[in-house]
Amino acid sequence: MSHPIRRISKSIPVIDFHAHTVVQEVREFSKGHVVQTSDPKNSSMSEEAIKSMETWIASNRRKMTDYSERLKDMDEMGVDIQVLTPSLVHQYTYWAEPEISLKMEQLTNNCLAESVAVNPERFIGLGSVPLQSPPHAIQELERCMGELGFKGVEISSTAEHMELGDAKMKPFWAAVARLGATVYLHPSGITDARYVRHQLWNSVGQPLEEAMAMSSLIYEGVMEAFPQLKICIAHGGGYLPFYAGRLDRNYREKPFLHTQMTKSPSDYLKENFWYDSCLYNVDMLEYLVEKVGSDRIVMGSDYPVGESDPVGFIRDSQKISDSDKDAILGLNAAKLLGLSV
């Protein structure tokens, strides 16, 4: 399915790959099971801090549902297109029975499709699936790619208590490959009490979950079995791309542990994954470009809670070339999503 391309600039379309939405009914259904709607008093914050946090959450939640405000923000940021994804931090349903979870994900995807249809020049949808049940996930993936016209789906870092590389997940990955779907991997957040204080679930837990998810996909042979997969990892891939030397050392010294791999972990990182630019530190972005290549990175703001000037963040780099900046700002995302530019 073709998709219209809008350009604010005359040269390239600027595409934000990391932009969240919320469906209120699904959020209410998930309340109590997700990290973002857990009781803030459990974090040992002061009463003043709790009030400030509640105000911050309410403000950003409004931005996830008010599309007129979203479009205004996009124009101010210089963003032509947002890739809309359901916020798994707010409305994670993998804990539910598969049939119930499927209904919630269908509702989410229907609402997302309606939002995209209102302004298809500005929005592209990536749906959500009940990943804890691969047969149900495949069913909804096929609907997303067919009936709803999405470009792919967003998933969390685990399928509830099942790792992404688990043998039971192989049919799902086979379906993703068959349909040519793009998968955006964004953790739903660690709810373990150890990560509650100081919102460590976000600052420490999210990149840790991304590293674990990628490791599972690499070491369990998913990337080897389906090299054509298009998987983009949020937050610059978490910790893994920045610590690949240790992975490679273990691969060299303990080959008997890595029987489903034909190349080093760092090679999979460079050749089999994509990453968004949501790193909040230009030095880290430049390092990521050096290690995996500029052609593997897409711009991501983490709207509405992340980088307020995602275009400037990339443009301000002194080490990334202008052509590589153009690729990161939009051309790579267009290629990944199959858009004509």
Language model features with spans:
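Charged helix-capping and loop-helix junction motifs
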Residues: I100-T108, G165-F172
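Mid-to-C-terminal alpha-helical segments outside catalytic/metal-binding sites
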Residues: S2-F17, Q24-I81, N110-V118, Q139-R143, ...
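Surface-exposed, active-site-proximal loop segments in enzymatic domains
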Residues: S87-L102, Q132-P135, H198-S203
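Short glycine-enriched loops at secondary-structure junctions
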Residues: S87, L131, P187-T191, Y303-V305
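Active-site gating loops and adjacent loop-to-helix segments of metal-dependent hydrolytic enzymes
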Residues: S11, H20-M64, W95, T191-L208, ...
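Active-site-proximal, glycine-rich beta->alpha crossover segments in alpha/beta enzymes
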Residues: E99-M104, N119, M145-G149
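Catalytic pocket-lining loop regions of alpha/beta-barrel enzymes
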Residues: P4-I8, V116, E142-V298
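Alpha-helical scaffold segments that form or flank carboxylate-/histidine-based iron centers
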Residues: I15, E99, V129-Q132, H136, ...
